[in-house]
Design a protein with these regions (language model features):
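Flexible "arm" and connector segments at domain edges
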Residues: 1-86, 90-157
Length: 157
């Protein structure tokens, strides 16, 4: 499956919104999505600059998350700018993966496999109060190290 199909499957399994034409989401969904992007960006910073120490993730939790605008209709919402920024983010992220030799599509498949293990004991999604999917009792971490090892070429380091 391509990345879009993986995410679509996740949304279907966890009963999250999917629209096939431009749609203005609720302020709560915008805040959740922007927060998730910032949270993952902070994880990237921790991995690049702090050997994965979670320093940036901690900064996100204590500072950046609280700086997001309150849940109200974003008056300045511009779907063209949002679409452009999302495309640019994906483009730049794939570019970074290429420069680092990271097989991003394979890593995404492994993360997707892990994400599908978040269901609760009853087979239903578990949500945080803001709508974020939480890890259930059968959750397992993605084995990204194995994916990278499987793609490692001897002598490349």
């Amino acid at each position: 499956m391509n990345p879009s199909e993986l995410v679509r499957e996740f949304h279907r399994v966890y009963d999250m919104p999917v629209y096939d034409s431009p749609h203005r989401p609720s302020s709560e969904r915008v805040k959740l999505r922007v927060g998730l992007i910032l949270e993952e960006f902070c994880e990237l910073l921790s991995g690049v600059y702090d050997n994965g120490s979670k320093t940036w993730t901690s900064i996100y939790s204590t500072t950046i998350k609280n700086a997001l605008p309150p849940s109200k209709d974003p008056e300045g919402y511009n779907e063209v700018e949002v679409a452009d920024a999302l495309a640019d983010l994906v483009y730049v992220i794939y570019g970074m993966a290429l420069e680092l030799g990271i097989p991003l599509d394979d890593v995404l498949e492994e993360v997707h496999r892990s994400n599908l293990s978040k269901l609760g004991e009853d087979g239903k999604p578990i949500y945080r109060e803001d709508g974020k999917v939480m890890k259930g009792p059968n959750f397992f971490e993605p084995n990204i190290r194995k994916v990278l090892r499987d793609h490692h070429k001897p002598g490349s380091f």
